[in-house]
């Protein structure tokens, strides 16, 4: 079992870092999944709940969280973590994995850490009982340099008049004085591309979104081309829907990165 746990963690890191990302399809049974956080081959839903868990642990509050991962065959494997009185208990549940051990194994661990760099993020239990002393329960890779293709088009504002477009290499900005700023041959710097790609991955941009409608016309349009996959979204700035909030935060991050460049280059 310990060997399989290590192999599973390694396989997840390979899948997350693969340079040929495709649109994420939900494995059979995903909709019935009642885990707090769902990891489908590196596409993670409800990642914010991991940070909520970390926050409560740091505040010494007794708390628990359930994380599900999916095998290539579509079977869920669960990491169920409980924090009680300064100690962590991990239940590694493979009872629904047709090709696994089909049992629940319990580990006790000393610490829980979040590690974040420019290209990867992981949540790790450390000081665990048994042969495996460190167990990654979530691993995310967002190294844009490993992608064969990453381009996007973002439209926003009144009538979606503003546009950040790396597909057609153009930038359009409404100056709010009756004039429009247009930049041709627009390109992002590598550092900017990395920041935006990281934000997209952490926003789980490849997953299916369930947007609420709170305005007559959508405030945002986003098209993403990543290797062989294409995703398109229209949504409004609705604060009562989690997907709307996450994608609006993503759009605002992209806008802020580009606006910072324009100000620094004195192009406005």
Where are these regions (language model features)?
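Internal alpha-helical transmembrane segments of multi-pass membrane proteins, especially GPCRs
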Residues: 7-10
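Detector for Asparagine
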Residues: 33-34, 46, 58, 62, ...
């Amino acid at each position: 079992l310990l060997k399989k746990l290590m192999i599973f963690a390694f396989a997840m890191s390979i899948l997350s870092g693969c340079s040929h990302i495709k649109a994420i399809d939900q494995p059979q049974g995903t909709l019935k999944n009642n885990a707090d956080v769902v990891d489908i081959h590196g596409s993670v839903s409800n990642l914010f709940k991991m940070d909520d868990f970390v926050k409560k642990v740091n505040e010494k509050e007794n708390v628990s969280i359930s994380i599900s991962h999916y095998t290539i065959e579509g079977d869920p494997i669960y990491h169920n973590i409980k924090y009680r009185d300064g100690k962590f208990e991990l239940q590694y549940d493979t009872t629904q994995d047709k090709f696994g051990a089909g049992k629940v194994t319990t580990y006790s661990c000393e610490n829980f850490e979040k590690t974040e760099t420019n290209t990867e993020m992981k949540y790790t239990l450390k000081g665990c009982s048994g042969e495996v002393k460190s167990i990654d329960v979530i691993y995310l890779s967002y190294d844009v340099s490993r992608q064969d293709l990453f381009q996007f088009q973002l439209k926003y504002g009144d009538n979606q008049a503003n546009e950040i477009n790396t597909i057609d290499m153009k930038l359009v900005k409404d100056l709010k004085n009756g004039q429009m700023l247009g930049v041709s041959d627009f390109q992002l710097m590598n550092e900017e591309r990395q920041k935006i790609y990281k934000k997209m991955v952490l926003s789980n941009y490849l997953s299916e979104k369930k947007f609420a409608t709170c305005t007559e016309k959508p405030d945002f349009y986003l098209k993403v081309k990543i290797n062989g996959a294409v995703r398109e979204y229209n949504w409004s700035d609705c604060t009562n829907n989690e997907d709307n909030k996450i994608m609006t935060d993503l759009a605002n991050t992209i806008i802020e990165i580009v606006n910072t460049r324009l100000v620094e280059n004195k192009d406005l």
